Design a protein with these regions (language model features):
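Short helix-coil junctions and helix-kink-helix linkers
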Residues: 1-21
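C-terminal helical accessory/scaffold domains
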Residues: 24-37, 41-173
Length: 173
């Protein structure tokens, strides 16, 4: 059988202290990113509107940081670039996808620079994101990936819009 240490109470105290430390660090990070108000003296915290938007739209923490860092007057090209950088929108780039995506990339609203090609998962998401409004027919395996990117982008864009309305600023108003 399993032998438990004689000092199980001490083990529980150490575990509790580690959990408390992790929670405090997480709260400090949320506060630093502007998602909560945290009183470090009392430990009291309250949700900011940004956190409510994040929760409502089910936006991942790292994606929310990207959204909060957007310039209030960012261009659509910048918006596409930044959203495609969000891990929750990225799909795996396969070797067979590159030729098809590079061909479509030439005709996008916001194409790559002439020397740039699709090389990363972020590049693939950037292309797929721009092909959604044009309803471009893709090969079967990429259709599901494009739908995945489109659904995720809708959530993220809804968060961007809610934040713009909340702050009464931004190019989306």
């Amino acid at each position: 059988g399993i032998k438990l240490p004689n000092n199980i109470g001490e083990f529980e105290l150490i575990l509790e202290e580690k959990m408390k430390d992790q929670c405090c660090r997480a709260l400090e990070r949320l506060s630093q990113e502007g998602l909560i108000n945290l009183d470090t003296v009392t430990g009291e915290c309250s949700c900011r509107p940004e956190a409510a938007v994040m929760s409502r739209q089910m936006v991942q923490f790292n994606s929310m940081i990207v959204i909060l860092a957007l310039s209030p007057l960012c261009s659509l090209k910048e918006l596409f670039r930044e959203l495609s950088a969000c891990a929750e929108l990225q799909v795996v780039l396969k070797r067979d996808d590159k030729k098809i995506l590079n061909e479509h990339a030439k005709h996008m609203e916001y194409p790559f620079k002439s020397s740039e090609k699709v090389k990363t998962d972020q590049d693939k998401s950037y292309v797929l994101l721009q092909l959604v409004p044009d309803r471009v027919k893709l090969v079967e395996n990429m259709v599901k990936e494009q739908e995945y990117v489109a659904h995720g982008a809708c959530r993220l864009l809804s968060a961007v819009i809610e934040l713009a309305i909340e702050s009464q600023s931004g190019g989306l108003l």
